[in-house]
Amino acid sequence: MINLFTIRSLVFNCFISIAAIVSTNAQTEKFSFNKFINKGDTLNYRMLFPLNDTLQKYPLVIFLHGCGERGNDNEAQLKCGVMNFASDQIMKQYPSFIVAPQCSENLDWYNFDGDFNSRKMRLKATPSKPMKLIIELLQELVKNNAIDTNRIYITGLSMGGAGTYDAMQRYPRLFAAAVPVCGFGDVSKAALMAHIPTWIFHGALDPAVDPRYSYDMIGALIQAGAHPGFTQYPEVDHFSWIPAYADTMMMEWLYRQCKK
């Protein structure tokens, strides 16, 4: 028998769920739909703009999604993590440009050689097509928007975490800070990015990307003279991006970074 309390609870839970969906949709709609085309290659991306103040420049965050959000709908890349940057509180406290590109099916943000299971990834000489397009897009955005080029940040989860390392090593003078989440990369090239303030996140129980990838990268960065931050969640598997991007200390740290 369903009592009145149960009915009220169900109604309340439905109301909360609907409110959350409406709130998420409202935040998603803040991101403009965009398409970057260069020499016949296309990169879909969404972009969030700060409230305009023509007297100042703003930081820019590049957000790289994971492999599950690949496609061409220009929507899936907003499912995980990036919406934390779009909250009213964060946008008010840290007004910035947020760029969320979408990687096409069967492509990657990174271009590595090696055996994934043995944690011996090696950076190839040329970037992947999606990464090349991101950098070309960024050049256009800097030309046409009030972007502070001393405060360009990059972050990503899983495949996007690997893409974050890839970008840092290929374009080490571009970024003011980086936040790779449950990612993997070429530890032999850690010295190239040792000067970039970096905060790494990983779940200790991650079955998809071995957390030892992060341990290895931290060790290599320290050996190269860096002082990376590291947060490991002891009871978390692959979904470490949920607590990582909800971390207000990380947000405060990220937006404080500026190239010297």
Where are the regions a protein language model picked out?
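Bacterial Sec-dependent N-terminal signal peptides
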Residues: 1-29
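A domain-start/cap signature at the N-terminus of enzymes
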Residues: 24-60, 96, 130, 136, ...
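Gly/Ser-rich "nucleophile elbow"/oxyanion-hole loop immediately N-terminal to the catalytic nucleophile
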Residues: 52-56, 111-157
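The conserved beta1-alpha1 loop
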Residues: 64-65, 202
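Active-site machinery of serine-nucleophile hydrolases
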Residues: 69-131
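Alpha-helical scaffolding within the catalytic cores
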Residues: 79-89, 182-191, 216
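Primarily recognizes the serine-hydrolase "nucleophile elbow" in alpha/beta-hydrolase
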Residues: 139-192
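C-terminal catalytic histidine-bearing segment of alpha/beta-hydrolase fold enzymes
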Residues: 181, 188, 197-260
